[in-house]
Amino acid sequence: MISIDKIDWLRWRLLQPLPGLEAQNKMAARVRELPSVIPDNAKLSAVLALLFPKKDILNLLLIKRVDDGKPHSGQISFPGGRKDTTDATLTDTALRETYEEVGISATSIDVIGALTSLYIPVSYSLVHPFLGFLPQEPKYMLSINEVQYTIEVPLHELFAPEKKIVTHITPAAFPDITLKAPAYKWDEEHLIWGATAMIISELEVLLNI
């Protein structure tokens, strides 16, 4: 099991060189290689991988996005979105989006550090993932236009070997395309793949070092 004792260690570890692309690629869809050069017109975005304790065991907050026909429609993801002109930093973006989408105040979140950014071609987004810690179980106020529901996942269960699969996925926004992709199969209804899985993969590698 992964306990809250890991938080201070993670804070230190995120200041060291990160596993980066090598760790992310463990869960990258086989349809493409990640570009080595990020386009100049990439849109800056940020997400928050929020950890919180349940009986001293670290859980990870995920959300199920609404089915709205957008590139990430219906997917399991982290709270997050595009950088706004009112955001001084990308950390501010991640915290603002988390509050807007699930109702958790920025003042209650301890931002531990940043994971490795990654480019998502389908949405032209350069995503900056941040790791946060909430010292108590969250209370939610969901944005019904963006989030169907939340999923609380104990890290040690998500990282179990049997949770990793390779499958064929037809994205809701692109019904004519089938991707071969590695994924975390949380249960029969919840498949975590794409950028979210790649971010989780780096966190998993960090915690297993």
Q: Each predicted region: which residue ranges?
A:
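N-terminal leader/linker segments that precede catalytic domains of diphosphate-processing enzymes
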Residues: 1-75, 82-100, 104-112, 118-128, ...
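Short, glycine/charged-enriched secondary-structure capping and boundary segments
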Residues: 76-77, 125-127, 145, 166
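NUDIX/MutT-family hydrolases
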Residues: 142-182, 186
